A protein has these predicted regions:
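Single-stranded nucleic acid-binding surfaces, predominantly the OB-fold ssDNA-binding core
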Residues: 1-93
Length: 93
């Protein structure tokens, strides 16, 4: 899904190591906002630091952003949650 949104806030980078793959990761939390027929809308998404760098957007910038949604169930707690990620924009030729 691609949306046109304003960057409201960008969190500090959080780092860790994947328990599944053993790979290091570095993510940021991004708060995005836009207006539609129902008024102001907001969504918080995670993004890998290197992907966010490719977008080159700063707080208050408006741009096209690609989002991926998936539902995940925790193996430990059986808790179900939605994972919203900012992903690279598809190549448009």
């Amino acid at each position: 899904m691609i949306i046109q949104a304003k960057v409201i806030n960008v969190s500090q980078t959080v780092t860790g190591k994947s328990a599944t793959t053993g790979k290091d990761w570095a993510n940021k939390g991004i708060l995005l906002g836009w207006e539609d027929e129902d008024g102001e809308q907001f969504i918080r998404a995670q993004v890998a630091e290197n992907i966010w760098h490719e977008y080159a957007l700063q707080v208050s910038d408006v741009g096209c952003i690609a989002l991926r949604f998936r539902t995940i169930q925790s193996r430990k707690s059986n808790y179900v949650y939605n994972d919203i990620r900012i992903v690279p924009l598809p190549n448009r030729q």
